[in-house]
Amino acid sequence: MEQLRSHPRLVRKLQEALGDQLCVALDDSNVVEIMLNPDGKLFIERLGHGVAPAGEMSSAAAEMVIGTVAHALQSEVDTEQPIISGELPIGGHRFEGLLPPVVAKPSFTIRRRASRLIPLDDYVRSGVMTEAQAATIRSAIDSRLNIIISGGTASGKTTLANAVIHEIVRSAPEDRLVILEDTAEIQCAADNAVLLRTSDTVDMARLLKSTMRLRPDRIVVGEVRDGAALTLLKAWNTGHPGGVATIHSNTATSALRRLEQLTAEASQQPMHEVIGEVVDLIVSIERTPRGRRVRDIIQVERFANGRYEIESDQLTEEREERHVA
């Protein structure tokens, strides 16, 4: 980022390669994702409209985009290292670029960084969640319960996490938040907050250990991906309740199994009881042809007699028919 700020020529080169259409799309708060396929076809996903064709881009322009991003990230991308991952220097959007031989022709995806905060009330108005579900989330925040937000790819986990964090700041403005991410996606307006980022040399587990010395009231993790899940559970369980994290899992109950898998990467001892004790609420959000919706919310009571004791607020068929978001 600093390198690019000091070299406006790189910015201009990237803008020229992207073209006016994609530069405008990156400024559009309704845009979720920009996708270029190896055949040169472009697709753009917009809130409320889904994915739609958006013209084409030449292989030369795509290769220039990927190369310019790699240059800005002080990385190399070529046939030996054909994949580049990082943040697009314009706007900090998430970028994934690929070159042959892993693809036939240059391809990339840009996940636009959300610039618009969607409050829980808007989720209710648009039918993404019910008033009862919003009330459950607010009650969990007020009670300093630990909340996991689960969902598949592009389901809206981070956007919902931002809404939950907004509620935390509103209800407990005195709390000090420490937020840990791999890529900058979390929005936090708290007066007392520390944002930490992983790097090539500092992983999430190391950041979590450092977090314990930063006197957090609440610990937020952008996405739990690996054995750092165990470190997070320990942090939440040692005087830092009321945290938020997202996890890649299609349902609320499968999020518990996913946590088991992740903690197993760091410990040979099963962590069922720890998970049952520390995780309080799991909110599952999904993307459907009709839009995103909170599929279910489960409250985790404990792990006993070989199973998790939970209370579930699952989307019923009647509510599913009414869903129009």
Swiss-Prot record:
ATP binds at G151, G152, T153, A154, S155, G156, K157, T158. Gene3D superfamilies: 3.30.450.90, P-loop containing nucleotide triphosphate hydrolases (3.40.50.300). Signal peptide: none annotated. One of its GO terms (molecular function) is ATP hydrolysis activity. InterPro entries: Conjug-transfer_TrbB (IPR014149), P-loop_NTPase (IPR027417), T2SS/T4SS_dom (IPR001482), T4SS_GSP_E_ATPase (IPR050921). The keyword Plastid does not apply. It comes from the Bacteria. It holds the Pfam family T2SSE. This is Probable conjugal transfer protein TrbB.
